[in-house]
Regions:
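Basic, amphipathic N-terminal segments that precede the first structured/catalytic domain
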Residues: 1-71
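Domain-level recognition of nuclease-like catalytic cores that cleave nucleotide substrates
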Residues: 2-10, 132-173
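Electrostatic, structured charged patches in enzyme active sites and in nucleic-acid/phosphate-binding
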Residues: 59-67, 73-76, 82, 124, ...
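Catalytic cores of nucleic-acid endonucleases
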Residues: 101-139
Length: 173
């Protein structure tokens, strides 16, 4: 059965110049768009042209059941932004890994790849020409280590551009 990523109760819209994406990390609630409380923002969306940008929570909102075990839920990313013909899948992190400094990146990458794989099986994916993903971590707003090879591999495997940062720019064309 095809998953409808756009028929979600967990959808909000903003045309503000700056707004944030939030996720209360330990509760079982969906991520959400916030226009007021910057202290809670894990990712900051910069929307200089005031475009109408939609956010749809995926984790804890859209059910994606595993193919190999239909009684278990698949790992999903936190949500997606879309506007015009662009789509951006987002994984929000707010933690530092003490043991492995890349663990949160690897974890986020797996969640994004899994969600994208299901999205690409839908006809809905055909209407988007620009496809990006972000792994945003409030504890690491800019990632120090070069991830160029990881980003190149991600693009080759999925067709999506990967960014590891917590500033999401809505470009002007």
């Amino acid at each position: 059965m095809e998953i409808d990523f756009f028929n979600s109760q967990c959808q909000s819209v903003s045309n503000k110049k700056r707004f944030g994406l939030c996720d209360e990390q330990d509760d079982k609630e969906p991520a959400y768009l916030d226009e007021r409380n910057g202290a809670k923002w894990i990712a900051v969306v910069e929307n200089d042209e005031l475009k109408e940008v939609h956010f749809i929570a995926i984790d804890y909102c859209i059910e994606i059941w595993r193919d190999d075990d239909p009684t278990k839920m698949e790992k999903r990313c936190d949500g997606m932004l879309w506007y015009e013909t662009s789509i951006i899948f987002v994984e929000l992190k707010d933690r530092v890994s003490k043991k492995d400094k890349n663990a949160w990146v690897e974890d986020g990458e797996k969640q994004l790849k899994c969600t994208i794989a299901y999205f690409e099986k839908t006809e809905q994916s055909d209407k988007f020409t620009e496809k990006r993903v972000y792994i945003a971590n409030k504890a690491h707003p800019t990632f120090k280590e070069s991830q160029l090879q990881r980003m190149k591999n991600f693009k080759q495997e999925t067709g999506y551009t990967l960014r590891i940062e917590n500033r999401i720019k809505i470009p002007s064309y």
